[in-house]
Structure formats: C-alpha cells, structure tokens
Amino acid sequence: LYGVDLVKTYAVNEALSALIMLVALLFVCLTEKKEFLIHCYLISYAFFFLLSFISFSKKFKSITSKLVSSEKINSMKVIKSFANYGLVSMVGTVASTSTSYISLIIIGIHLSHSDAGIYSSVLTIVSILMFFPKLFTQVFLPEFSKLFGEGDNKRIFQIFNKTNSVMILLSALICLIVFIFSHNILSIFGKEFSEGSLILRILIPSLFIRMISIPFVSFLSGTKYVLYPNIGGIIILIISSLCWVLLVPDYNLVGIAIGYTAGIVIGIGYQIFVAILKIKSFSTNY
C-alpha cells in the first residue's frame, strides 16, 4: 500500500491489526490459555491482510487508470533484470533479519536455557524500542521513492537533512534512558532477568545505529541504490557469525551480544557511509 502512495491507509491498517493482537494477547493472559498464544498472531496478520486487500481493491481502478503503456516490454529482459535484483535483495533481507534468530539458535546449542531466556528478553526490549522509529521508514521510503521518480532531488535532500538531526537526537535520548535504567527495564520480566542488564547495554550501540540509519537506509531503498542496504545485511551476518565463532567459547552470552553489536555497527555503518556518498550528488546544487 505504501508503495502506491497509500501510506496513511497502511498505517491505519497496521495500527488496527496491532490493537487486535493486543486485545487477543490480553484475553490469553487473563484466561491463562497458553495454547491459543500463536492464534493471537495469526488473527492479527489475517486481519491486516484482509484490511489491506480491501483497501487496495477499492483503490485499484484509480491506481491503474494512471498507468499508460506507451511501448512494448521485453518480458525475458524484465524477468532477467528482476531475478538479478531479487537474488541480492532476497539474500540481503534474509541475512539481516535472521541474525537475531541465529544468535538464539547458537545460545540454544552452546549455552543454557536461562541464557536463552535472558537474551530473548533483551531482544524483546530492543524490538519494542525500534517500533516507533520504524514508523518513520513507512513514511520516508514511499516519499523518497515518489520524489526520486519525479526527479525532485532538491526536496529529497531537504527532507533528509531535516529528519536526520531529529532522528539522532531522538535516538540518543532513548538509548541514554535505556542505558541508565536497563536493570529496571529487564526486571519487568522478573528479577532473574535483570541479570541481562549488561547484555542490554552491550546492544545499545546497535540499537542507536539502527535508529539513526532509518533516513539513510530509506534514502537508499527509495532510490536507485536499493541494493546497498541488502549488501549491508550480508555484511551484518558475516561479521556477527565470525565474532560468535571467536567469542562465544570464552565469553558465552557476552560474546553473543558483542558479535551481534559488531555485525550491526559495521553492516549498517556501511549503509550509512554509502548513503552519505550518494546524497552528496543530490546536494551539489543546493
């Protein structure tokens, strides 16, 4: 939906789906029917799919009416080009999103169940903190893509310039609060989970760089430089995996956290570096 300039509709659908999930989870918790826990997610995503399908169906005619086929398209050429892009995109996306899950698998193999529980609680906090910054992505990405298609590079540079400073200040504030109150935050899951405060603090640099990278990655993904974020995802997995092999035997859970942070900092650092280089070409005349 946000790919066809229906960002508001997408956001409303996602918010309603999240509300459905929260209500379902609350019901499961109050009734203590743990066997229905997975159903909360299934109902939420099914509801989101249904809303999105209905929203897109209503706008389909108005969207397609603006499309004009002025020349013949070579199907094989399009498929080949899409396959080349899709392969890198698929590998990069899988690599970046699977890093946290792979770290849990490594903990399950080499460390104890209590370590896995502590690390899972830390990742849960990180995921929650990333929720609001990620909302910016759903606005930046279609906006950058639209402006790039219109050739309005000046507007892209202006938006990037203004939002970048806001994201840095917001991210610094959030990370500072988490660092100071890490022990209290994790105690929400129980006193024994507060032992993971050191792990959470080690992950804070990765949380900070993920937050501030949102305008940079959205710029790359919304323009012709879409492959660079996927390359960064591959770098994340490679660096993290190497660190885990070297550090986990001696440093256990701390080694897992260091490896995860190292991968994120280097991989996303690469994405930010590339974005800075590319945005300079947009700012040459402004």
Where does each model-flagged region fall?
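Membrane-interface junctions at transmembrane-helix termini in multi-pass inner-membrane proteins
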Residues: 1-13, 205-235
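Interfacial/gating helices of multi-pass transporter permease domains
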Residues: 35-39, 77-89, 104-127, 194-197, ...
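Helix-loop junctions and terminal segments of transmembrane helices
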Residues: 3, 122, 126-151, 219-222
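Interfacial segments at transmembrane-helix termini and the short loops linking adjacent helices
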Residues: 113-114, 179-208
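Hydrophobic alpha-helical transmembrane segments
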Residues: 11-62, 235-239, 253-277
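Interfacial transmembrane-helix starts/ends
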Residues: 79, 83, 152-169, 173-180, ...
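Residue-level signature of transmembrane alpha-helical cores of multipass secondary-active transporters
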Residues: 10, 14, 81-93, 97, ...
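Interhelical loop/hinge segments that connect adjacent transmembrane helices in multipass membrane
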Residues: 8, 35-41, 52-100, 143, ...
